[in-house]
Curated annotation (Swiss-Prot):
Domain notes: The ice-binding site may be formed by 7 T/S-X-T motifs.
Major location category of this protein: membrane
Motif Probable ice-binding motif (T/S-X-T) 6 boundaries: 198-200
Keyword Cell membrane: no
Protein name stated in the entry: Ice-binding protein
Residue interval(s) of motif Probable ice-binding motif (T/S-X-T) 5: 180-182
Sequence motif: Probable ice-binding motif (T/S-X-T) 2, positions: 65-67
Lineage: Bacteria, Bacillati, Cyanobacteriota, Cyanophyceae, Nostocales
Chain positions of motif Probable ice-binding motif (T/S-X-T) 3: 128-130
Length: 269
């Protein structure tokens, strides 16, 4: 009976882990509609310099110009001034307005995001927002944790700034920006940028677990990587809680569990 229970425990852990990842990704897709299929979406144009990589599709609407591809690589499809890109912009605008309508939990106006550790919620800036250093997002073990940053005007990050997570990945991070975003050189960004005007990714900026979506203006790139794939780097992982804290932690310990029982599977139960 113990041997059977061990088998079931591993199977349940796999199912639970897969389910949590699917639900979290579905929540992000639901918010963005067809815009979720794009890594970069520009309103007037998308321009690139250097060997950038976009792991999803690239779109431009209502403009029609996407330059610098190649040398940049787009693993998805390039859509310019067509019905696919137009619908993505409609969905982008819908998501932008929905995010803007949410009631904030906390006003961060005047604070630098760098050095803060934030839990899921809606955070607002009446005007501009700045990130200098490291912003930590604590998911509290919730795979569907939602972080929304409502920014009245601009978002600017200093060189080599970063966003990291603890207690899980963060597929549902949204920056709703009233005008434009400029990410400083070497910034390691995480989350979806929905800017009313433009987005500038300077040299060496990477966006993980997110997208660069500009409604009316340009997206400007320079040797960047943009991917909606989510992951937690080893040094950013939190200590796994005791087993009785939540079913969600089964996913966190899945790899260790599989290694522990690998030899037993080979020998038979």
């Amino acid at each position: 009976m113990l041997k059977i229970n061990r088998k079931y425990a591993i199977i349940l852990a796999i199912v639970a882990f897969s389910s949590f990842q699917t639900e979290a990704k579905a929540a992000s897709i639901s918010m963005l509609g067809t815009a979720s299929n794009f890594g970069v979406l520009g309103g007037s144009t998308v321009t690139n310099t250097g060997p950038s990589v976009i792991t999803e599709s690239l779109g431009v609407s209502t403009g029609s110009s996407a330059t610098g591809f190649p040398p940049a690589i787009v693993n998805g499809t390039i859509f310019t001034s067509d019905t696919v890109a137009a619908q993505a912009q409609v969905d982008n605008a819908t998501a932008y307005n929905k995010l803007a309508s949410l009631i904030p939990n906390k006003d961060l106006t005047g604070l630098d995001l760098g050095g803060l550790t934030l839990t899921p919620g809606v955070y607002s800036f009446s005007s501009s927002a700045q990130l200098t250093g490291i912003l930590t997002l604590d998911n509290l073990g919730d795979p569907n944790a939602l972080f929304v940053f409502q920014i009245g005007s601009t978002l600017t990050t200093a060189s080599n700034s970063s966003i990291v997570t603890t207690n899980g990945d963060a597929p549902n991070v949204f920056f709703q920006i009233g005008s434009s975003a400029t990410l400083g050189t070497g910034t390691q960004f995480m989350g979806n940028i929905l800017a009313l005007t433009s987005i500038t990714l300077t040299t060496g900026v990477n966006i993980d677990c997110g997208r660069a979506l500009a409604q009316n203006g340009a997206v400007t790139m320079d040797t960047n990587k943009v991917s909606n794939a989510c992951y937690t780097k080893p040094q950013e992982k939190a200590v796994v809680p005791e087993p009785d804290s939540s079913l969600a932690v089964l996913g966190s310990g899945l790899v260790s569990l599989l290694f522990a029982f690998r030899k037993r599977f080979r020998k038979g139960w």
